Amino acid sequence: MAWRYSQLLLVPVQLVFLASVCCPGVWGSTVSEELHRMVGQSLSVQCQYKPKEESYVLKTWCRQTAPSKCTRVVTTSEPRKAARELQHTIWDDPEAGFFNITMTQLTEDDSAFYWCGPYYPSLREVTVLRNISLVVSPAPSTLPSQTIAPLPESTATIFMPFPVLTTSPEETTDSSINGTGHRNQSSSSPGWTSPGLLVSVQYGLLLLKALMLSVFCVLLCWRSGQGREYMAETMELSKLPHISKSLDTVSHISGYEKKANWY
């Protein structure tokens, strides 16, 4: 019986594992890749996607300005042609299935969350492929900027794409996010929430539900076992009157035999 209960306890744990494996978009899309640079350095990012033999889809580099929207920094106009906006450059190769973004002469004001992905002008929507957290630190005052050793790139991770609404630098209309929200490190919005905290809360709630389900299953099986034991005891007790009647009959016959022997 104990082994049976332990097997039931494993069911919610297996469900949690399957949810994390089968639905990476739910858990993984809120995780950001943190990249560190110093003032004056450059940043290069590559975003990969599945090549498609359809009409060309624009690609963009988008900076988060609030938990519910982002502003496009630089956007492609056609394949295999570099597009430049200030210190930002983007270049796309649809046949290879990737596009590169370069940011030069970084300043501390460039510290923010950035998204890269396909851009759909009619919907004003970006399908986010990567979520980059850029942290630009001041250069050491004792060393010239050209002697600063470049910091290593973060390991590239492909996330489950999810769409968000966006605005261009000229547009000021507020747009709501259509997917999972992300915070902007440089944003002063009081409603901002850490993605890591949101993930922890989601995991905690899911594990709490799994634990409650486990307790319910154990109690249900325990009550069922108690019911079966009660029925078995009732059946055994119901047989006792027949046994007592049999004993009375045997006792009665023995009495007659004793009287016969006496006569």
From Swiss-Prot:
Lipid bilayer topology: Single-pass type I membrane protein
Membrane-side (Extracellular) residue stretches: 29-200
Subcellular location: Cell membrane
InterPro entries referenced in this protein's UniProt entry, alphabetically: Ig-like_dom, Ig-like_dom_sf, Ig-like_fold, Ig_sub, Ig_V-set, Immune_rcpt_domain
GO BP terms: defense response to virus; innate immune response; phagocytosis, engulfment; positive regulation of defense response to virus by host; positive regulation of toll-like receptor 13 signaling pathway; positive regulation of toll-like receptor 7 signaling pathway; positive regulation of toll-like receptor 9 signaling pathway; protein localization
Protein name per UniProt: Trem-like transcript 4 protein
Reported induction: Induced by synthetic TLR7 ligand gardiquimod (GRD) in cultured splenic macrophages.
Span of domain Ig-like V-type: 29-132
Record keywords, A-Z: Antiviral defense, Cell membrane, Disulfide bond, Glycoprotein, Immunity, Immunoglobulin domain, Innate immunity, Membrane, Receptor, Signal, Transmembrane, Transmembrane helix
Main function: Positively regulates Toll-like receptor signaling via TLR7, TLR9 and TLR13 in neutrophils and splenic macrophages. Regulates TLR7 signaling by controlling ligand-induced recruitment of TLR7 from the endoplasmic reticulum to endosomes and lysosomes. Positively regulates Toll-like receptor TLR9-induced production of inflammatory cytokines but is dispensable for IFNB1 production. Involved in the anti-viral response to several viruses including influenza virus, vesicular stomatitis virus and cytomegalovirus.
Region of interest (Disordered), ranges: 168-191
Signal peptide residues on this chain, from the entry's feature table: 1-28
Top-level taxonomic group: Eukaryota
Free-text note regarding domains: The cytoplasmic tail appears to be dispensable for TLR7-mediated signaling.
Gene that encodes it: Treml4
Knockout or disruption consequences: No visible phenotype. Mutant mice are born at the expected Mendelian frequency and are fertile and healthy. In response to CpG DNA, a TLR9 ligand, levels of TNF and IL12B but not IFNB1 and CXCL10 are severely reduced.
Oligomeric and partner information: Interacts with TYROBP/DAP12.
